[in-house]
Structures are given as C-alpha cells and as structure tokens.
Amino acid sequence: MSRRHSAEKREVLPDPKFKDIIVTKFMNQIMRDGKKSVAERIVYGAFDLVETRAKKNPVEVFHNALEAVAPAVEVRSRRVGGATYQVPVEVRTERRQALAIRWLAAAAAGRNENTMRERLAGELMDASQGRGNAVKKREDTHRMADANKAFAHYRW
C-alpha cells in the first residue's frame, strides 16, 4: 500500500430506475465477474418481490434494512506489549454503509431460497423488521465491542 498517494474515491452514478446512489453501491456488491446487467436484474427483481409481498416502497424497505444492519461500533486488533487486544472503536459513516451493504449481500447469499432475487427480497424484508442473519451479524459485532469495553482506552 502506497504511503504517498491514496486512491481517489470514484464517483458512483445513481441507478437508472430509482436514481439512488446507495442502490447502485448495493448492485455493485451483488455483481459478480463484472456482470452489471445480471446484478441489476437480481436487485430490481428482488425490489419487485418486496413491493408485491410487503406492499411498501422497496427503496424505503431497502434503506430501513441498511439502517438496521449498519454497525455503530466494531472491534479492531491492537497489539500492546506482546498481547493483542480487541479494542472497540466507532465506525465512520462511510464504513457503516459499506459494511451494511456487504453484510446484507452475504446474508442473502447464505439463505436457502431458490433464486438470488428471492433470497435478497427475503433478507431485505427480514432486516427491515430487525430479523435475519445480517442483523444478527450487527448484534454480534456490538456484543464483541461491549465485551471488550475495558480496552477502550487503547483506542487510536
């Protein structure tokens, strides 16, 4: 990793259907092997399923799910005199969003419905109601941070 120059942030364009940048970021996370059109079909298909099942605006459900999954604190390893401590630190806004997107996509992939759009729709609806594996991941992360509160003074 270069110490001189950090890579500049690329601008993410809003998605064509909902004009939402976060939906595009989610699509990019779902995308495999550069197949954006496949990812687009999966995400929009999942949103259609959410709309028919939940009778709500799918983008609102998506944003609620992200909010329910985004962690406030996480633990980072810090080495102090031969011992490694798990130090709880607050999560920056950008990283919160990135982690929430990543965890939602991973939790959806781990479900056992037939198609990815069904898995995604199920996970989005579960997460927006405070259930599902992505929310469990957030709670586990918070629990770890809480358990290691004693090492908070090692923060950097």
From Swiss-Prot:
One of its GO terms (molecular function) is structural constituent of ribosome. GO terms for biological process: translation. CDD domains: uS7_Bacteria. One of its GO terms (cellular component) is small ribosomal subunit. Disulfide bonds: none annotated. Keywords: Ribonucleoprotein, Ribosomal protein, RNA-binding, rRNA-binding, tRNA-binding. Coiled coil: none annotated. The keyword Ligase does not apply. InterPro entries: Ribosomal_uS7, Ribosomal_uS7_bac/org-type, Ribosomal_uS7_CS, Ribosomal_uS7_dom, Ribosomal_uS7_dom_sf. It comes from the Bacteria. It holds the Pfam family Ribosomal_S7. Part of the 30S ribosomal subunit. Contacts proteins S9 and S11. One of the primary rRNA binding proteins, it binds directly to 16S rRNA where it nucleates assembly of the head domain of the 30S subunit. Is located at the subunit interface close to the decoding center, probably blocks exit of the E-site tRNA. Belongs to the universal ribosomal protein uS7 family. This is Small ribosomal subunit protein uS7. The gene is rpsG.
